[in-house]
Amino acid sequence: MTNQKRKRTSTAAPKKGGDELTYSSYLALDELLRLQRPRSKPEHPDELLFIIVHQASELWFKLILHELEGLIALLEARDTLGALTSVRRVNALVHIVTGQLSALETLPPQRFAQFRGYLGTSSGSQSVQFRAIEAMSGMRDEHFLQVLKQHGEIAPLVQRALAKPTLQQLFDDLLEAHDVTLEQIYAELHQRPLQMLAEGLLEYEQGFAMWRFLHVQLVERIIGPGTSGTGGTLGSKYLQTTISQRFFPKLWEVRSKFFNG
């Protein structure tokens, strides 16, 4: 009986500083819930919604970056099934971020106009984590690099993302390691895991494109198509140019080969 009691005690989580870990302390809720600081005077009742949706998006961006790091490591290790599981999680996270936009659709333009001036020059285009996600996913063209430099030096987080191989490059390397082509993974049944991974990557791009599209619609719904962004951007006109950007052009192009000989 004594031995059993000792065994149960030894498996208990150690206490730090004699304080019991609680839900609140583990999640640092006291600090987290103090981070919403509306700037409007008097405080506009809708500004808290605006802040929380954007803060929550940044938390999800942090997790997406973390998962993309893991996906890259799995692709580098040639772990097809592990990468497939990883990309499914990334896709679920992108879906969550996209769903959050519906909350901002409840913000009428006249009410946003009442506190928009308090945002100053802050803009979603300044999101370092979002830019890092784009870079890690495959955005490397000159236009993208010029956009990054609009706000000064490229942030270290984005620089690290740019230093990594893109997801497309890593998938190409995976195909080369298996000595197969893109056409073969779609034509040969035994290449099903690679095909599923390719479709998972394509779903990731589609999810990202859907977020972009709905973001454009949201911006135009709230501030209209002719209003400039708070950060000096062209507003929805700039966002429109991002919709057609693709991470995996080869995964789109291979489909044509089954119909055009």
Give the role of each language-model region.
Residues 2-261:
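Surface-exposed peri-terminal alpha-helical interaction modules
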